[in-house]
C-alpha cells in the first residue's frame, strides 16, 4: 500500500541521514587526528631546530684553548706516580703532569691545573670546569657522560693488606668475607671494582683527601684494592704494606677525559697521542717513572 511505501521511504531516508552523519563524524575525527599529528610534527621540528645551533655551531674546546692560550686540566694530585701535588708549593708533578705539559707546549699554550676530586672529576668535564682530565680508568659508567681519548697505559688491579696479615689474606678470595672490611676511595674505579670482587665484605668508603690505603695502615680496614702502578709505589713508601700474592685482576686502560661529543678536540688529542707514541715520548716517560704497561 501507499502507507507501506511511505514508511519504507522514511526508513531509507532515515538510514541515509544517520549514515551521512556517521560518515561526517568519521571524517571529522580523521580530520582532527591529522590536524593533531601536523601540530605535533611542527612542535617536534621546532624542538629539533632549537637544538641544532648548539650541536652544529658549538665552539670546540680546541678553538677555545687556542683562542684563550690556556689549556685547563683537571687533576686530583693524589695518585702516585701519575699526579701528585706538593702541599708546600702547591705544584703538581708526575707522569700525567709531564704529559699535559708536553701537550700544552706542542699546542703553543699555557697549562692551568684545576684541582679535582675523584668523586667529582667527571662532573668537572661535563660542567666545563676544565678542557681535559689527567689519566682516569675507562669505565662504562664514566663513558655515559664523558668522552675518552685513546689509551696509552694498561694496568692490573691488586689488593693491599698489612704485611703481618699476609698469611691471613693470601688470596683475593680470602678477602671476600663478611668479617672483612675493604676500604675504598669515593669516586674511583676501584670503588666499583671492590663491590664486584668482594660482595660479601663490608665496604668502608672514604672521601679524598683521605685515601683507602690509609685506612689499612690505621687498622680500620683489612685491605684495599688499587692499580698495580700505585701498589708498587706504596709498598716501597710504606714497608708495612704488602701486595696479596695472588696475581693481578681486571686489566684496565688509562685515558684522558674530554667533553662528550666534542669530536674535533678528541681527534686532535688522539692524533697527538699517536704521534707521541711513534716518537718514543711515552716509552721514555714510562721509564722515567719506572712504569711498565701491561
Question: What are the functions of these language-model segments?
Answer:
Residues 60, 189-203, 243-245, 273-294:
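Ligand-binding clefts/hinges and TM-proximal coupling segments of bilobed small-molecule sensing domains
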Residues 77, 154-161, 228, 232-274, ...:
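Periplasmic-binding protein-like
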Residues 59-136, 144:
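Extracytoplasmic small-molecule ligand-binding "clamshell" domains
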Residues 1-14:
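Single conserved hydrophobic/aromatic residue that forms the stacking wall/gate
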Residues 69-75, 93, 172-187:
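Short loop->beta-strand "edge-of-pocket" segments that line small-molecule binding or catalytic clefts
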Residues 97-98, 112-123, 204-218, 252:
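Short helix-initiation/N-cap motifs at beta->coil->alpha
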Residues 119-123, 136-144, 192-196, 214-250:
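A ligand-binding cleft/hinge motif common to bilobed small-molecule-binding domains
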Residues 62, 163-180:
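Flexible hinge/capping segments at coil-to-helix
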Amino acid at each position: 500500500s501507499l502507507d507501506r511505501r511511505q514508511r519504507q521511504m522514511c526508513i531509507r531516508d532515515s538510514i541515509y541521514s544517520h549514515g551521512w552523519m556517521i560518515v561526517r563524524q568519521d571524517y571529522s575525527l580523521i580530520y582532527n587526528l591529522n590536524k593533531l599529528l601536523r601540530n605535533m610534527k611542527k612542535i617536534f621540528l621546532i624542538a629539533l631546530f632549537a637544538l641544532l645551533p648548539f650541536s652544529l655551531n658549538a665552539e670546540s674546546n680546541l678553538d677555545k684553548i687556542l683562542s684563550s692560550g690556556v689549556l685547563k686540566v683537571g687533576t686530583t694530585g693524589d695518585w702516585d706516580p701519575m699526579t701528585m701535588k706538593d702541599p708546600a708549593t702547591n705544584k703538581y708533578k708526575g707522569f700525567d703532569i709531564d704529559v699535559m705539559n708536553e701537550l700544552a707546549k706542542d699546542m703553543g699554550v699555557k697549562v692551568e691545573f684545576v684541582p679535582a676530586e675523584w668523586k667529582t672529576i667527571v662532573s668537572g668535564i661535563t660542567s666545563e670546569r676544565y678542557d681535559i682530565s689527567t689519566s682516569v680508568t675507562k669505565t662504562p659508567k664514566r663513558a655515559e657522560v664523558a668522552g675518552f681519548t685513546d689509551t696509552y697505559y694498561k694496568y692490573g688491579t691488586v689488593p693491599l693488606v698489612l704485611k703481618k696479615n699476609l698469611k691471613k689474606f693470601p688470596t683475593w678470595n680470602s678477602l671476600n668475607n663478611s668479617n672483612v672490611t675493604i676500604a675504598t676511595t669515593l669516586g674511583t674505579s676501584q670503588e666499583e671494582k671492590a663491590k664486584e670482587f668482594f660482595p660479601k665484605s663490608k665496604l668502608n668508603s672514604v672521601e679524598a683527601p683521605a685515601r683507602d690505603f690509609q685506612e689499612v695502615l690505621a687498622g680500620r680496614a683489612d685491605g684495599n684494592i688499587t692499580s698495580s702502578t700505585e701498589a708498587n709505589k706504596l709498598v716501597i713508601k710504606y714497608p708495612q704494606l704488602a701486595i696479596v700474592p695472588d696475581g693481578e685482576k681486571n686489566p684496565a686502560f688509562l685515558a684522558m677525559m674530554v667533553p662528550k661529543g666534542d669530536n674535533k678536540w678528541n681527534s686532535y688529542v688522539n692524533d697527538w697521542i699517536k704521534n707521541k707514541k711513534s716518537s718514543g715520548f711515552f716509552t721514555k716517560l714510562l721509564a722515567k717513572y719506572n712504569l711498565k704497561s701491561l
